């Protein structure tokens, strides 16, 4: 079996590492991002990939810059046949891509060339895509520009959240990776150049992406809310401060002339309706700042909103990176 050098950081990558190990592939080394401070205490937290590697007694490398010649030389000494890269978090130099004689294979959570870049899962939902998928790709020095090896398509349901799609794509991606490694080992792995048409970029999520702008159409806000569930969440500002909205539905606006961001109805046993730039959102689950998530009806019962309450965009929130985020 091929000897694998694995590079990855978050849980999405850990799923692929587990799959390789369960399939019996010898993983000669694991490269992941350095431990990062997390939580209020700032305690260093290992990446999910590091946790899997340590649990299996694998050598772990955490260079701050993989481009350094001495790091590349150290990894070459492991004697890997193929490098597998899944959400590692650093751009790889040509020297790093050539550590293994058979090259480097990447697992990317989109149907390339659509959604090249750092946040393809959330960007696909935010754009209202009804289909995405996973590609395995022969890596080159560009950002997700290499030849595609294998592809698997995955539908995006109208209620699918970012977390649900992440988990499904991680599972599908791990299966596709195993098939890709088998094809590489057999010598018949495809190399399909990406088309020049249809290229889009999935920019890294920034704090501004979390802000709910009620002047936008309700459909766009709905996609934003579900794309950012369960992390990092979408925010607005109300009379009681910042409010995170976790679940909502697009509904007709019962008060078409209302200013966007205005509560226009309280809906018994369901929540409250907020006017948007086009249509309205029936808010079903919220989280006041510093409190636990709750259904919107409980928030209404506690006096959180009433008809006429105004929400406005908050300043872009500061947040901690997700576990394993590069």
From Swiss-Prot:
Pfam families: Formyl_trans_C (PF02911), Formyl_trans_N (PF00551). The gene is fmt. Attaches a formyl group to the free amino group of methionyl-tRNA(fMet). The formyl group appears to play a dual role in the initiator identity of N-formylmethionyl-tRNA by promoting its recognition by IF2 and preventing the misappropriation of this tRNA by the elongation apparatus. Keywords: Protein biosynthesis, Transferase. The keyword Transit peptide does not apply. Its EC number is 2.1.2.9. (6S)-5,6,7,8-tetrahydrofolate binds at residues 110-113. One of its GO terms (cellular component) is cytosol. Gene3D superfamilies: 3.40.50.12230. CDD domains: FMT_core_Met-tRNA-FMT_N, Met_tRNA_FMT_C. Belongs to the Fmt family. This is Methionyl-tRNA formyltransferase. GO terms for molecular function: methionyl-tRNA formyltransferase activity. Residues 307-326 are annotated as: Disordered. It catalyses: L-methionyl-tRNA(fMet) + (6R)-10-formyltetrahydrofolate = N-formyl-L-methionyl-tRNA(fMet) + (6S)-5,6,7,8-tetrahydrofolate + H(+).
